[in-house]
Amino acid sequence: MALILSACSQENSPNETAVVTENAPQTTQPSEAIRIAAAANLSDVLPEIIEGYKKDKNLPNQEIEVTFASSGKLYSQITAGAPYDIFLAANQEFPAKLVDGMFKGDSSRTPFTYTQGQLSIYSAAKPVDSLNQSTLTELLKRDDKTKITIANPELAPYGESAKAYLQAQNLYDSLTAKKRIIQAENIGQAFQYAHTGNVDYGFVAQSQVTAIKATPEQFYILPADSYPAILQDGIVITDVASAADFTDYLRSPAGQAYFAKAGYLAVK
């Protein structure tokens, strides 16, 4: 069988898929396919975790289908009946809304925290490693030509935290009024805008910076206490046994090691 990845963001065609075939011999009978709806910021680390899961569990032929998109878009798909087994959001809000909505009264559907994200400033062309909160604020205030990008704060938790950070620095309203904020659909597209030079700076996930092996001068990790904590929750949607087994692996020391290596903060 295969690991199937798809994306719902604008930077990837909705119909585009990547298939990686496993040639290792089957040592354990795989369960039925696991279908995962995953926040766009997981597009780099989740495939590695899946391969680790299949190796550690002796399930080389386990089929796992992943759709990456903004958490808000995935939430809408799930409430509309999309056939997912697991929802891995980029915040705690959307899994909680499922509990209060379509899973109301079902005590077996309990969200769990699987990682904590870090917010960074990234630029493909301008050095940012010498920045701190004060100098970043001054930079964004004084340079009227500078454009930044954030993910849609209504749909993407990283965008919501970026907006909160800018509001705390009394920057958001003025930058919006001057049309200096280029809003991306999700964190994946925000990173593409910054990485390709379409904007000067991007508020991105540190995991994205780690994935491309960015040089130290290309990013600045914002202090964790300067924006709302990006605690990422998941929830098992169906009764597929392998879905619960996979989410247990996410929270295990082995799963958390993948997250830490990828630029996230491990959770217990």
Task: Enumerate the language-model features and the residues they cover.
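Exported/periplasmic ABC-transporter solute-binding proteins
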Residues: 8-54, 59, 72, 79, ...
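Bacterial Sec-type N-terminal signal peptides, specifically the leucine/valine-rich hydrophobic h-region
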Residues: 4-5
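A short beta-strand/loop micro-motif in the catalytic core of glycosyltransferases
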Residues: 88
